[in-house]
Amino acid sequence: MNISSPAMYTEKEASSKRYKYAACIILILIIITYSLFILKKDALHVDEVLSFVISTYNSYGFKKNFNEGIIYTSSALKNDMFGYDNSIHDILDDIISLRKNNRDSPHTNFYYSLLRVSFIGSHFSGIDTIMLRAGILNICISIITFIFLYRLSLIIFTTDIARITCLILAFFSPAAISTVLFYRPYQLQTLFFYYQYFFILHNNK
């Protein structure tokens, strides 16, 4: 059969549609799975605490110590460490401060700035508030990551089975789920890796 014949073109087009439908189903399952895990999360790792303290540019919990002569309530401790003002002016001030010095030299300020923006429209009423916002942010980053890997799989693999397997392994592995649940810049790092890889291959294919 001639590879340019209508029959071959129709077969290839049908295969592409199957992959698109499968990818949509996988993405929906990813969002549901990640959301369920995030809703079940009830504690923070010490590094995650650092993410929130840095993003809101608070001093307590970072360089400023609590007064040893004062007995604090748990609510007061949480408010001093995680409290924030949700006004646009204060958010911009924090982002500018993060740009000048994010106080975490191994990482850029980008994730912390996104985390700060994610608090728009909310008031600190407990750790659950910021955990939920951070979880939604990581899910949004995962969706963008999924789009780039979807496009990347079209370049790397030639069969739908290989592409679907790639998406499943990349987003349903224990490591992938753990990264989404860990509120640090690593999910954003994964996104940039796929973006860079896609950009290189897309421009050299």
Task: Show which residues each predicted segment covers.
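Transmembrane alpha-helices of multi-pass, membrane-embedded glycan-processing enzymes
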Residues: 102-107, 111, 115-122, 134-148, ...
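Membrane-interfacial, low-structure loops and terminal tails that flank and connect transmembrane helices
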Residues: 1-16
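Interfacial juxtamembrane loops and adjacent helix segments
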Residues: 56-107, 115-131
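Short acidic/glycine- and proline-prone juxtamembrane loop motifs at membrane-interface regions
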Residues: 181-186
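Transmembrane-helix signature of polytopic, membrane-embedded enzymes
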Residues: 128-132, 149-172, 190-191
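Hydrophobic alpha-helical transmembrane segments
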Residues: 21-25, 113, 136, 164-168
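Specific aromatic-rich, kink-prone transmembrane helix
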Residues: 117, 148, 168, 172, ...
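Transmembrane signal-anchor helices characteristic of membrane glycosylation enzymes that use polyprenol
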Residues: 18-86
